[in-house]
Each structure stands twice: as structure tokens, then as C-alpha cells.
């Protein structure tokens, strides 16, 4: 059975993200005193009393005509539909508000267990402030302080009471992949088109996707994936707004937490320097890579358009010569059905292991074709090679003198390894060591 899901809902600035972060044990959600900052659902694992579960932090529900109001409402409704338990957060400091009553009315219709958390009860003298919230009709209010961690144990005790009895620890074999790229290249639209569910708010405002959101799905073939849609990463030296700066930090963490990276390029805008910076970070992290050219439907084409664009990509992204390229349209759905299988294939290659005997046969055949270089009368001698790691595949080559291994010859050996084994989509690392 999959882990139970707990949705944290409520109007803006009652401290949902603070409680979320306390339960998750790290700063997952963006926390800022600006209504509407937590605009998309955030997912994070948590554990209490040997129960593992997943939490969803939603954008707040607010009365008024704010630009994101209708979409945020929709996000909360989706979270409610997915949750096993709902935690409604209110503010003991501000007291009961009309917006709280609106949220409660939404929850009446959910037929899901609801636990009422009165946040910002930062000292015992404030505990009497919780009684007004009985008027919401959601049962006993639990006084907590997200900022100080007070009362969260009692709250978690109540939450896990509502979990199905079968809830148990599960090992996660899903393939994790991130979708990265500059703002407005269509990352969120690709997510929505692939999932068939409006899981991420999409608008034409740069930076709408403010944080990384984990989304689990299973294909018809039974392959399980966790997709992480990240905020558009800006160049690190040009980040001024606090929220955006933190989003970039989270995006980098999402890359670290992923097996495979989908690098999205805007076909209309072409390739920019920032695309190369973003791709470079993922490459340096050693992740498997796929280059996704989005908005291909908007390009006027002839019989050479695709090959010309592919050549441009290969020229601009020389360090990603191993990455397959796919031309898609999130708007029309063109070729999006290929992405899950491509992700699985490059992940398999990322995890691939080659036996030492087979590897050494390839190395020795390569040396027979192109003998090792020499310097000042001393010739490089290659003794043997072995694979020492996967993700990415990493090989150690033992030689007589590391200084004799020219970069060009190391590249030659890497190419021969790639020719012999399918490492499409994954970087490979060669480590040259002197045999003692």
C-alpha cells in the first residue's frame, strides 16, 4: 500500500508552511509574509510513530479577487481529493475569520477526516484563544506553535489515528526525474500534459512555479515515476528577490535528488547562455540527461529544420553529446508520450554495470587500434580497468603514470566504451590512477 497522504490547508499566512517544515524536518516550502506565496502544492515525506506518510502544503484560500484565487482554490480541491487526512490550520493570534469559515465549508463536503490545528499559540496563556474555533464544527482544536514546535506531537498523534491500518513502510523504487530550464520554457505545461491533471498552476507570468513539487505517477506499462517540476532557474549572480533566490536553491536540491534530468529548451526563443548554465549544473551533478525542445508546433519547418536545430544544440551543448534530443509540443501533446520510456531507458543506462572482463576486452581492443601516447621516451601503459560505481557509471583505469594520460586519449577510451555499451543519456566518469 502507498503511504497515506496528509493535506495541510487554510487561508494565507496562518503558518501552514511552518508546520509543514516542522513535520518534514527541513525547509521545504517557501515561507514569506506575502499572501499567496505558497502557490502550488508541495509534497514531502514525513514519519511519526513508525508511520511513513506524505504531506501536501497547499496555497492558501483567500476571499477576494487576487490573480491566483481561483487557481489556488482548485489546488486545494485537488489536494482534498487526494488526501487521506486533512489538517486545517487557523491562527490563534488573529482569531476566527470569515476566510476560515469559507475553508471549513469546503472541508464539510470532503468526507475526509479533518484535524483542526490552531497555530501561533506560542505560550500557555494563549491556549484559551482556541475555544472560538469550536464554532467551525470540525471537532477539538489542537493548539500548536509551528515556529516553536509546541503541540506538534499531540497534533501528529491525532493525524496518524486516522491512517488506514495497512499503512506501512515501503521501499521506493520509482524513477525520480526533474524538469529544468529557464522560466517560461513550458516546464509546467509539460507536467500537466503528461499527467492529464492540473497539478501545477500555469500562467504566463515568469516565475509562477515558485517551488519544486514532487508528483508520483504510474504508466500503463506499470513503470512508476516521481516527477519534480522545478522553478525556472535564474543565473545565480542575478537573483534579487528573496523568494526567487530560495526557489533556485530548491531547484538545485531537486536536481541532486533526481536520477534523470529533462532539460527543456524553448524552440521559439532558441538557446541562451542561461540554458547552458542550467544544463551545466545538472551535468556536473552527474545526472542522466534528456534535452526536450518544447513549443515545436510554433516553428515554421522544412525538411532540414529539425536536423539544423539538433546541430545547433550539439554545437552549443558540447558537454551534453550523450543526451538524446526530443522535439515536443506541450500544447498539442506531440511526442510527449515518448518521454516516460525515454526516462526509463536513460535511467537504466545510468545504473548499468559492466563486468571487468568485458570492459578490459574493449580497452585492449581500443589500444590495439590506437596505441597509447608517449612523452620524452616514456609510453603510457594501461594495466586494467574496472567499474567502481553507477549513477553515473564510473570506471577506474590503472596505468603506470597518470601524467602520461593525455586528455585526448582519455576521451578516445571513453568514446570506445560508449561505442561498445549503450550509455545513451548518461555521463560516464573515467578516473585514472597509477598502479602501486
From Swiss-Prot:
Domain spans labelled KH-like: 352-436
Sorted UniProt keywords: GTP-binding, Nucleotide-binding, Repeat, Ribosome biogenesis
Domain EngA-type G per the UniProt entry, residue ranges: 4-167, 175-351
Binding annotation for GTP 2: 181-188, 229-233, 294-297
UniProt similarity note: Belongs to the TRAFAC class TrmE-Era-EngA-EngB-Septin-like GTPase superfamily. EngA (Der) GTPase family.
Subunit organization: Associates with the 50S ribosomal subunit.
Protein name as it appears in the record: GTPase Der
Gene responsible for this protein: der
Amino acid at each position: 500500500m502507498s503511504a497515506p497522504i496528509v493535506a495541510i490547508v487554510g487561508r494565507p499566512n496562518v503558518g501552514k508552511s511552518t508546520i509543514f517544515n516542522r513535520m518534514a524536518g527541513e525547509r521545504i516550502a517557501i515561507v514569506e509574509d506575502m499572501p499567496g506565496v505558497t502557490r502550488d502544492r508541495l509534497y514531502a515525506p514525513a514519519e511519526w510513530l513508525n508511520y511513513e506518510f506524505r504531506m501536501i502544503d497547499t496555497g492558501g484560500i483567500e476571499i477576494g479577487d487576487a490573480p491566483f484565487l481561483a487557481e489556488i482554490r482548485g489546488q486545494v480541491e485537488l489536494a482534498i481529493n487526494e488526501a487521506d487526512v486533512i489538517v486545517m490550520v487557523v491562527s490563534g493570534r488573529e482569531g476566527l475569520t470569515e476566510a476560515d469559515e469559507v475553508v471549513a465549508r469546503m472541508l464539510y463536503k470532503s468526507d475526509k477526516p479533518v484535524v483542526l490545528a490552531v497555530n501561533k499559540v506560542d505560550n500557555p496563556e494563549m491556549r484559551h484563544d482556541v475555544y472560538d474555533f469550536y464554532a467551525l464544527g470540525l471537532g477539538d482544536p489542537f493548539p500548536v506553535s509551528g515556529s516553536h514546535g509546541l503541540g506538534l506531537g499531540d497534533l501528529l498523534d491525532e493525524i496518524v489515528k486516522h491512517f488506514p491500518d495497512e499503512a506501512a513502510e515501503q521501499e521506493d523504487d520509482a524513477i525520480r526525474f526533474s524538469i529544468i530550464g529557464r522560466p517560461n520554457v513550458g516546464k509546467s505545461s509539460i507536467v500537466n500534459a503528461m499527467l492529464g491533471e492540473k497539478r501545477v498552476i500555469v500562467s504566463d507570468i515568469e516565475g509562477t512555479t515558485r517551488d519544486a513539487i514532487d508528483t508520483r505517477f504510474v504508466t500503463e506499462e506499470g513503470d512508476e515515476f516521481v516527477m519534480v517540476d522545478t522553478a525556472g532557474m535564474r543565473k545565480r549572480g542575478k537573483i534579487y528577490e528573496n523568494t526567487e533566490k530560495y526557489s533556485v536553491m530548491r531547484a538545485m536540491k531537486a536536481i541532486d535528488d533526481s536520477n534523470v534530468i529533462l532539460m527543456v529548451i524553448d524552440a521559439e526563443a532558441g538557446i541562451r547562455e542561461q540554458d547552458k548554465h542550467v544544463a551545466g549544473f545538472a551535468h556536473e551533478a552527474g545526472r542522466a540527461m534528456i534535452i526536450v525542445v518544447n513549443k515545436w508546433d510554433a516553428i515554421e519547418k522544412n525538411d532540414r529544420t529539425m536536423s539544423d536545430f539538433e546541430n545547433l544544440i550539439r554545437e552549443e551543448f558540447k558537454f551534453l553529446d550523450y543526451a538524446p534530443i526530443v522535439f515536443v509540443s506541450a500544447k498539442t501533446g506531440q511526442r510527449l508520450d515518448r518521454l516516460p520510456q525515454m526516462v526509463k531507458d536513460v535511467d537504466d543506462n545510468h545504473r548499468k554495470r559492466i563486468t571487468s572482463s568485458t570492459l578490459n576486452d574493449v580497452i585492449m581492443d581500443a589500444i590495439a587500434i590506437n596505441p597509447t601516447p608517449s612523452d620524452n621516451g616514456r609510453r603510457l601503459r594501461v594495466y586494467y580497468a574496472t567499474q567502481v560505481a553507477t549513477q553515473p557509471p564510473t570506471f577506474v583505469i590503472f596505468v603506470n603514470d597518470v601524467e602520461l594520460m593525455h586528455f585526448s586519449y582519455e576521451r578516445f577510451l571513453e568514446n570506445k566504451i560508449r561505442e561498445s555499451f549503450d550509455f545513451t543519456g548518461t555521463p560516464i566518469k573515467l578516473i585514472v590512477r597509477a598502479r602501486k
